[in-house]
From Swiss-Prot:
This is Antimicrobial peptide lumbricin-PG. One of its GO terms (cellular component) is extracellular region. Keywords: Antibiotic, Antimicrobial, Cytolysis, Fungicide, Hemolysis, Secreted, Signal. It comes from the Eukaryota. One of its GO terms (biological process) is defense response to fungus. Residues 1-14 form the signal peptide. Displays antimicrobial activity against the Gram-positive bacterium S.aureus ATCC 2592, the Gram-negative bacteria E.coli ATCC 25922 and P.aeruginosa ATCC 27853, and the fungus C.albicans ATCC 2002. Displays stronger activity against P.aeruginosa and S.aureus than E.coli. Displays very weak hemolytic activity. Residues 25-48 are annotated as: Disordered.
Length: 73
């Protein structure tokens, strides 16, 4: 059976020899991967640089702070 270039590209893109490898570590070693906290704290929010107000037509109006300061939300 002859493989064309398109067949070779299809096979190389759809099947990976690393996709379904068995984990050879014992269960006690694998279990240690999932111990401990499973979350991180959220990052601090950046302060807003402009204030957005909406007019009666539904269009936004952007107001910039004076002297490069930050606007409190």
């Amino acid at each position: 059976m002859l493989l064309t270039i398109s067949d070779f590209l299809f096979l190389s893109l759809t099947f990976s020899r690393y996709a379904r490898m068995r984990d050879s570590r014992p269960w006690s070693d694998r279990k240690n991967n999932y111990s401990g906290p499973q979350f991180t704290y959220p990052p601090e929010k950046a302060p807003p640089e402009k204030l957005i107000k909406w007019n009666n037509e539904g269009s936004p109006i952007f107001e910039m702070p004076a002297e490069g300061g930050h606007i409190e939300p």
